[in-house]
Amino acid sequence: MAETATRSDSGMFWKATTYKEQYWDGYLAARPKYSSDFYERIVDYYKAHNPSPPTPTVAHDVGTGPGQVASELCKYFDKVIASDPNSTHLAVASARNEKSGLNHKITWTEVSAEDLNSHYPAGSASFLAAAECLPLLDVPRALNTFAHLLHPNGTLAAWFYGRPVFSEPTVAAKCQPILNDIIDLTFEKVIKGAPPAHKTTWKRSTDTLYSFLDNVAFPTETWRDVYRFKWNPHLPLSVVGPNACDYPIEPSSCIDPEREKVVEAKDPHFWEEVWDIFEVRRFVECLLPNIEELKSKGVYDHVEVKYKELEEAMGGANAKKEITWPVVLILATRV
């Protein structure tokens, strides 16, 4: 079995609190599949900037969730450290990787991304992945921690995808506004009813996502060779829209064009899925682990009307439509 370190956490505004295999099967099925060429882009960058890393090579998977990125990193690194502030997520990830025979390579650590530097020594890692988590963090603190963990020439890879988007223009014109309404109505009560500390986190996250992570700064004394790859940047990266929020959304940018390279591509087939209404609905509902409890209280009755409207717009219960994603990938090298 893999090692597991523990640390309490009380600051999560989203977390699953019980290990339900059915929920996690649905969660992973409802997420986009990171393609092999996506991982190859990351690994090629890592090898080009770090041709002779210390051995054994160590990679961190920060905010591991159900552990699918940790599994992939096992192909490229001798040892993987997968961390998450939620003990349930770690239990899920460990169980899933035990089945695939990978746990002998993985150490599971219950800790927030910002506090990893209290668990692992400086310069102890060659690579660090932050998948679908950076906007949820205190970014300056997290980047300081990542810089602490990486040895010189080590690689940071941070990526995030947004809401699913109907890729065919005529379908998108009919269906996307309804899906956007469904997502906003689903999250409206969660966000507007959040306590002040969680509201601050939502605000920070929303600003970062509406900035397409352009507001994430990489200081010259710590990072070099910063690349920002964006797929479908004409689409919103934030899952929630303004109607779900009761605070101003303030995008910004701190990109330094003299030292950072931005590469953009409009690709309606990027990470393409073909979904029916059930699969679209599964994506939305897996975002909130307690959705069934809320539905049983009648909180989301008004959303059911919208789902019916979307089903009709898609062409019926069995109709399948092409789905794509807005995605950003940031690669940076430790000085």
From Swiss-Prot:
Classification via CDD domains: AdoMet_MTases (cd02440)
One BP annotation, GO: methylation
Gene Ontology MF: a single term: S-adenosylmethionine-dependent methyltransferase activity
Family designation: Belongs to the methyltransferase superfamily.
Residue stretches spanning the membrane: none
Pathway in which this enzyme or protein is active: Pigment biosynthesis; Secondary metabolite biosynthesis
Induction (record text): Expression is significantly up-regulated at the end of late growth phase, in the presence of Butyrolactone I. Expression is positively regulated by the pgm cluster-specific transcription factor pgmR.
Enzyme nomenclature, EC number: 2.1.1.-
Protein name stated in the entry: Methyltransferase pgmE
Keywords noted in UniProt: Methyltransferase, S-adenosyl-L-methionine, Transferase
Gene deletion effect: Does not affect the methylation of the naphthoquinones derived pigments and only abolishes the production of pleosporalin A but not of the 2 other final products.
Gene that produces this protein: pgmE
Function: Methyltransferase; part of the gene cluster that mediates the biosynthesis of pleosporalin A, ascomycone A, as well as a third cryptic naphthoquinone derived pigment, all responsible for the coloration of conidia. Essential for the production of pleosporalin A, but not the 2 other final products. The pathway begins with the biosynthesis of the cyclized heptaketide 3-acetonyl-1,6,8-trihydroxy-2-naphthaldehyde by the NR-PKS pgmA.
Enzyme class: transferase
One Pfam family it belongs to: Methyltransf_11
Keyword Electron transport among UniProt keywords: no
